[in-house]
Curated annotation (Swiss-Prot):
Family: Belongs to the bacterial/plant glucose-1-phosphate adenylyltransferase family.
UniProt-annotated binding residues for alpha-D-glucose 1-phosphate: Y114, G179, E194, K195, S212
Reactions this protein catalyses: alpha-D-glucose 1-phosphate + ATP + H(+) = ADP-alpha-D-glucose + diphosphate
EC number: 2.7.7.27
Sorted UniProt keywords: ATP-binding, Carbohydrate metabolism, Glycogen biosynthesis, Glycogen metabolism, Nucleotide-binding, Nucleotidyltransferase, Transferase
Name listed for the protein in its UniProt record: Glucose-1-phosphate adenylyltransferase
Gene: glgC
One GO BP annotation of this record: glycogen biosynthetic process
Organism in which the protein naturally occurs: Pectobacterium carotovorum subsp. carotovorum (strain PC1)
A Pfam family annotated for this UniProt entry: NTP_transferase
GO molecular function, one term: glucose-1-phosphate adenylyltransferase activity
Length: 425
């Protein structure tokens, strides 16, 4: 009898994740998020009422069956390390399951920080080789999406690829922020350019370009050879998008994996949700997406749960103040430990332990944990950073000139408020 197990998709979906290790690149500064990343790495930024951004990549790994994970850290890593220790320490080491933290560190062979994404992996090769994985999945730790990496691994193996790059169409006018590729009918990558000034449009859709998601699958031995060679190339930027992927494409060894094949959706919903929340506007908008009646990203999906650190908090409370005004919310996410007293909260996201005192009006605003909103405040189109104490009567989002003088105001009119900004008033 012929054994076809090695070609059975269900068998491959179980086996390939067990033969893989995921490396999450989580050392980025995220400078476009301004004050939100002054004291924390971008992957550690709060998102969606109770999560951190990195929870999406970590949850995708777990749900895909990948339980050997390395998180490569560098910039302002304490908050990120603390979150992973508290929320992701439940894997069973006896079953060779782990989330390893791989910080930048002084080594005999190097005297510098990570110089690029490829160098970040290269500097940890001594550790990564000990994992004895057949496949290495490289992930960005700062995107919001749900994806089954096992489907990408199957695609990689069935094509006999050395490297597979996840991709999706993006509007042509936005494509200069991504790696852009051209592919043939079999999805072999023919050309790749990192953040080109003039992105190549898709042949069948000239208003769109095919962009890299920053998600790669490599045959492990091939990756190690590439990294060793790149390490010894003096003029390299030591970056996957700028150096390694173009080199692999020139050798015709790279294949594209359309996000449509591995995007996780709920029920009849076919929206392929992926967001780079690298700017304040994108971050604000993606948070408020979750507060809509039918959000494109379903975080309530029991079949693909997004995990995070769990806090023991009392339920959110909406109370009547002494004047008889009721605490009310509409189209909003309100987390545990919040108290809304005699105020109205509309289309907003309140993270844990937010206190909204009486007579406030809050609209289209994201409020991070431990914020106190004083009486009679009016907030509109804001992001309030953690542990801010807004004084009584503060108005934000109604006067552009005043907002720009006191806080950071984006071109689209989103206002960021941090503790350091409040201390200067």
């Amino acid at each position: 009898m012929v054994n076809n197990d090695k070609h059975d998709p269900l068998m491959l979906a179980r086996q390939l994740p067990l033969k893989s290790v995921a490396l999450i690149l989580a050392g980025g500064r995220g400078t476009r998020l301004k004050g939100l990343t002054a004291l924390r790495a971008k992957p550690a930024v709060h998102f969606g009422g109770k999560f951190r951004i990195i929870d999406f990549a970590l949850s995708n790994c777990l749900n895909s069956g990948i339980r050997r994970i390395g998180v490569i850290t560098q910039y302002q890593s304490h908050t990120l390390v603390q979150h992973i220790q508290r929320g992701w320490s439940f894997l069973n080491a006896e079953m060779n399951e782990f989330v390893d933290l791989l910080p930048a560190q002084q080594r005999n062979a190097t005297d510098h920080w990570y110089r690029g994404t490829a160098d970040a992996v290269c500097q940890n090769l001594d550790i990564i080789r000990r994992y004895r994985a057949e496949y290495v999945v490289i992930l960005a730790g700062d995107h919001i999406y749900k994806m089954d990496y096992s489907r990408m691994l199957i695609d990689h193996v069935e094509k006999g690829a050395e490297c597979t790059v996840a991709c999706l169409p993006v509007p042509l006018e936005e494509a200069s922020a991504f790696g852009v590729m051209s592919v043939d009918k079999q999805h072999r990558i023919l050309d790749f350019a990192e953040k080109p000034d003039n992105p190549t449009p898709m042949p069948d859709n000239p208003d769109m370009a095919l962009a890299s998601m920053g998600i790669y699958v490599f045959n492990a031995d091939y990756l190690y050879q590439l990294l060793d060679a790149d390490h010894n190339t003096p003029d390299s930027n030591h970056d996957f998008g700028q150096d390694l992927i173009p080199k692999i494409v020139s050798q015709r060894l790279a294949w594209a994996h359309p996000f449509t094949l591995s995007c996780v959706t709920s029920g009849e919903d076919e929206n392929q949700y992926w967001r780079d929340v690298g700017t304040l506007e994108a971050y604000w908008r993606a948070n408020l997406d979750l507060a809509s009646v039918t959000p494109e990203l379903d975080v309530y999906d029991r079949h693909w749960p997004i995990r995070s650190a769990i806090e023991s908090l009392p339920p959110a409370k909406f109370v009547q103040d002494r004047s008889g005004s009721h605490g009310m919310t509409m189209n909003s996410l309100v987390s545990g430990g919040c108290i809304v007293s005699g105020s109205v909260v509309t289309h907003s996201v309140l993270f844990p332990r937010v206190r909204v005192n009486s007579f406030c009006s809050i609209d289209s605003t994201v409020i991070l944990p431990d914020v106190n909103v004083g009486r009679s405040c009016r907030l509109r189109r804001c992001v309030i950073d953690r542990a801010c104490n807004l004084p009584e009567g503060m108005v934000i989002g109604e006067n552009a000139e005043e907002d720009s003088r006191r806080f950071y105001r984006s071109e689209e009119g989103i206002v960021l408020v941090t503790r350091s900004m409040l201390e200067k008033l």
